[in-house]
Amino acid sequence: MIIYSKLEINRIKDFWELLNRLDTETDYMMYEPNERKAKTTVQELKLDIQDNVIQGFDFLQVATENDKIVGYIRAERGKFERNFHTAYIVIGILKKYRGKGIGTTFFNNLDLWAKTNNIVRLELTVECCNNTAKNLYEKNGFKIEGIRKKSMFVA
């Protein structure tokens, strides 16, 4: 059974490992395989979570099965008065767990947080060829607003 919860700070290393696994499992996350390990640390991630999520600015939820973190969704709220009503979304689900409704549940829970926190615009970036993600986003009400050519180079 999948359980959805806030990330407990004592699970930060498990979350770090999930992020690194997602980086190697798919070509569609921002980091190249092993790039995250070279550019940041578990401690930096912990500070980010403490400063932004635990303080209530951002949303972060994980999905677990048998105590293993299998996916997450994060919404990073705008930091200025003019964009404080927006949040940028990142979602990652291990390949084995895709197509099981985890993404839809994440978005339903995110919508509740957004309404409670006066977020009126949720946004994200997806590669044109990532049809699985595009279908999930469109199913959850997202619309394509434009194409950013040459914004990412995937090796």
Where are these regions (language model features)?
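Active-site acidic-Proline motif in GNAT/NAT acetyltransferases
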Residues: I91-K96, K100, C128-C129
